């Protein structure tokens, strides 16, 4: 995460270039809006607009002080981010849906792996087959089932070890 431009491929061709950099406080509104929009697209039956106030508190009080947040920016616009805490827990991987299917998400996961050389754990909604397949392609393994303590939804625990 050095501010270098990272080309992202889609089907073998370079489609866009992104700058990966550390999160800045000025990114808060864009990051929260991106979180809401992408989760709403992934789970249209859930009212994520109603959760924005809760998410802003969680973002400010839990993630920003305790995790490395790496953002991907294209032409000055936030296109994605990943959070990784010192224990190697990946809480959020958020990518603008316009870049779903590109290599942007795996580029962000690779940045998280650099921050967590001993390994990464994460929870993924059990009904999110697309995300599960993505994490498997990134080298993660399933390591059990659980229930998300916040949403009550069934989740899979996944781990990556170097």
Predicted regions span which residues?
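Conserved GNAT-fold acetyl-CoA-binding loop/helix
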Residues: 28, 32-59
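A short, internal acetyl-CoA/4′-phosphopantetheine-binding micro-motif in the GNAT/acyltransferase core
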Residues: 90-100, 124-125
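A short helix-loop-beta-strand connector motif used in the catalytic cores of GNAT acetyltransferases and
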Residues: 58-71, 89
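Conserved beta-strand in the GNAT
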Residues: 71, 77-94
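Conserved acetyl-CoA-binding loop-helix of GNAT-fold acetyltransferases
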Residues: 95, 101-114, 133-137
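Conserved GNAT acetyl-CoA-binding A-motif
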Residues: 115-127
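Conserved active-site alpha-helix within GNAT-family acetyltransferase domains
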Residues: 106, 127-144, 150-153
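Conserved N-terminal entry element of GNAT/NAT acetyltransferase domains
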Residues: 1-26, 160
């Amino acid at each position: 995460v050095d501010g270098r431009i990272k080309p992202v491929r889609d089907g073998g061709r370079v489609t866009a270039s992104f700058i990966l950099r550390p999160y800045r406080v000025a990114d808060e509104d864009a990051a929260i809006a991106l979180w809401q929009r992408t989760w709403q697209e992934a789970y249209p039956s859930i009212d994520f607009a109603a959760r924005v106030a809760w998410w802003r508190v969680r973002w400010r009080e839990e993630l920003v002080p305790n995790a490395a947040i790496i953002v991907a920016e294209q032409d000055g616009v936030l296109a994605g981010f990943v959070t990784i805490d010192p224990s190697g827990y990946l809480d959020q991987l958020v990518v603008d849906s316009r870049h779903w299917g590109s290599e942007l998400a795996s580029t962000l996961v690779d940045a998280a792996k650099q921050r967590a050389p001993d390994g990464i754990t994460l929870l993924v909604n059990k009904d999110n087959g697309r995300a599960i397949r993505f994490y498997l392609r990134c080298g993660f393994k399933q390591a059990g089932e659980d229930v998300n303590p916040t949403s009550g939804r069934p989740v899979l625990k996944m781990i990556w070890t170097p």
